[in-house]
Amino acid sequence: MRKGIHPDYQEVVFMDSATGAKFVAGSTLKPEETIEFEGKTYPLVRVEISSDSHPFYTGKQKFAQADGRIEKFNKKYGISSKN
């Protein structure tokens, strides 16, 4: 690899703004803010949503009600729901 063309790769703490959960991961981001985490000082990146707060990962996701739309479609096109 050529020197001087790749961004610096470093460990960064990502903090979920909603829950306060912190994750250490590698990144090329260079934030100004730092944080003490597990005895070391890391650059800090604040994120709005992470796997700790996203409904898909927390199991609190909501499914859209398709029942009414399916019935409306069947009625519109004269499809009988009986087998």
Curated annotation (Swiss-Prot):
Gene Ontology cellular component terms for the protein in this record: ribonucleoprotein complex; ribosome
Q: Name one Pfam family in it.
A: Ribosomal_L31
Keyword Ligase assigned: no
A biological process from GO: translation
Q: Which domain of life is it from?
A: Bacteria
Any one Gene Ontology MF annotation carried by this entry is: structural constituent of ribosome
Q: What residue ranges are annotated as transmembrane?
A: none
The entry's keywords? Ribonucleoprotein, Ribosomal protein
Q: Which InterPro entries match?
A: Ribosomal_bL28/bL31-like_sf (IPR034704), Ribosomal_bL31 (IPR002150), Ribosomal_bL31_B (IPR027493), Ribosomal_bL31_sf (IPR042105)
Q: Which PANTHER family match?
A: 50S RIBOSOMAL PROTEIN L31, CHLOROPLASTIC, LARGE RIBOSOMAL SUBUNIT PROTEIN BL31C
Identify its protein family: Belongs to the bacterial ribosomal protein bL31 family. Type B subfamily.
Q: Which NCBIfam families match?
A: L31, PRK01678.1
Self-association state and partner proteins as the record states:
Part of the 50S ribosomal subunit.
What name does UniProt use for this protein?
A: Large ribosomal subunit protein bL31B
Q: Which organism is it from?
A: Lactobacillus gasseri (strain ATCC 33323 / DSM 20243 / BCRC 14619 / CIP 102991 / JCM 1131 / KCTC 3163 / NCIMB 11718 / NCTC 13722 / AM63)
